[in-house]
Amino acid sequence: TPTMKEIDELMEAKPEIIALDATNRLRPGGVTLKEFYNAVRKEYPEQLLMADCSTLEEAVYADGLGFDFIGTTLVGYTEESKDVRIEQNDFALIREILNRVTHRVIAEGNINTPEKVHKVMGMGVYSVVVGTAITRPQAITREFVKALEK
C-alpha cells in the first residue's frame, strides 16, 4: 500500500487491517512514513494499521507513530536486514521488539513451521502470519526436494 490511491481502493473492501511498508525505503513522491501514516490516519481514523518492519529501529519508530500492530514482515527482505533471519539467536529480534514497543506485535516472515509458530506465540506476540509456507505449493515442494537432496 504505497499511496493513498491503494488505501482508498482497499477501504472499498472494508479491510480489518491495512499494512504499510514501515521501512526506510522511498515511497512514491518522496513521502515519508510519518507523512503517509498521518494522511491515512486523518482520512480513516478508525482503520487498524500494521507496520511492516525489517529492523528493530523501524519497529520502534512505527510504534512511536502509533501503528496498531508492529509486524516483522520484512525482516531479511531489505538492504538493512538482508543478513538477518527471524529465527536467529532464538528469535532475538522478536524478543527485542516485544521489549521495546507498546503496540501489539505480529510475527510474520519465515515463520514457516508449527514449531516456530509455537515458539513466537509463547514469547508473547499477538498473532502469527503463516504465508508462503501454506499458500505457495512450489515453495512447499522445494523444501521437500531440498530434504531429499541431502
Region locations from a protein language model:
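Catalytic cores of alpha/beta
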Residues: 1-12, 54-68, 101-107, 111-130
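Short secondary-structure boundary segments
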Residues: 22, 53, 74-75, 109-110, ...
